[in-house]
Amino acid sequence: MATSSFRGGLAMAVVLLPLLLLLALLAPLQCAAAAATCVGLAPAKRRREVISITEFGGVGDGRTVNTWAFRKAVYRIEHQRRRGGTELRVPAGTWLTGSFNLTSHMTLFLARGAVLKATTDTRRWPLVEPLPSYGRGREMPGARYASFISGNGLRDVVITGDKGVIDGQGEVWWNMWRRRTLQHTRPNLVEFMHSTGIHISNIVLKNSPFWNIHPVYCNNVVVTNMMILAPHDSPNTDGVDPDSSTNVCIEDSYISTGDDLVAIKSGWDEYGIAYGRPSSAITIRRVRGSSPFSGIAIGSEASGGVSDVLVEDCSIFNSGYGIHIKTNVGRGGYIKNVTVDNVRMSGVRVAGVRIAGDAGDHPDAHFSQLAVPTVDAVRITNVWGVGVQQPGSLEGIRSSPFTRICLSNVKLFGWRNGAAWRCRDVRGAALGVRPSPCAELATSFAAAGSCSF
């Protein structure tokens, strides 16, 4: 009887241990909930006028295709502007539609129980030109499919709601990718180009065909209080990808997708170098989630440069990497002034921290071997993890070593002892790091030079 009780208690402990570890990871983040916020960059404005999609013939029965209704509604907002802007309200129901554009000074509001579903008829998706900083579609040469919801050259746009859902119904696109039958690059779920004052909050995004939220060439973008979901085997379903954009705030959100939770980008090889628009002033705060790839990533498409990034109070679990900075010869550009602070991680299958100079593919054979990127001034502090296969891999480029890689109070433990840091072509310092870091990192900040915390 005693043996049976012991076995039962042991089994219960095995079940509860992962939950207890997860609670331990999240507790410090809950305590930080009253910390700073950057949502003031693009607040959710209250509109003076409210109209409903039903006024334009919309039918939320899950069968009627409402593309024309949404396009008529947006046309009305654009061409009969009201002082203070207009809210387009989508009531409870299932609203099937093709892709559509938004306009300036509008709010798209999804009520509780509203589900906006993308059509699975790929013939209904228009093609658009490739991004100039990519030179081609990200997956295929030439044009790309238009994003499900998009805007170009806009100001003051809000997508929000009362936990309404935008469902990209991406399975048809994922299967085309798996079968290698894609003719063009898959559509993003939400994309804004050349826009400012973009606010996305309080809704659920799920099953995106490709990247979920893609602000590109934008300024003053806020993504807050979001839930972004896709199966872990869904290809390239990144959560939020700020791309050649400045003043971006991503806060208080849960993301579980098939690729990086957040990936900061700025163009691809020679096209990104020529376009020359960096990403800068990016804040990622109180984001939780899991991914088969990276929790928080920078790159690998960073040819326009990335700088002034703050990642703090985040929790990453069941992922491939925790923090992942990735670039490659041919990318050019720079990644600098990156601060990562107070990050918790568990169940990391590859490495807790990876900074790599050999990551990512190329758009074509025309990239230059002389376009060598620089990585400088990366500060990683107060990071703690359990179940981390390898604590870290810091591998720079022989002709351009990564400099001022500074670690402080970083403790990443595996399920078994013996895992070690791996370093090459990197310079910096480490204090209070466990397991002990590699010899390439000095044991004092003074010796490393300019490692200031």
Predicted regions and their residues:
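Extracellular/periplasmic carbohydrate-active domains that bind, remodel
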Residues: 2-453
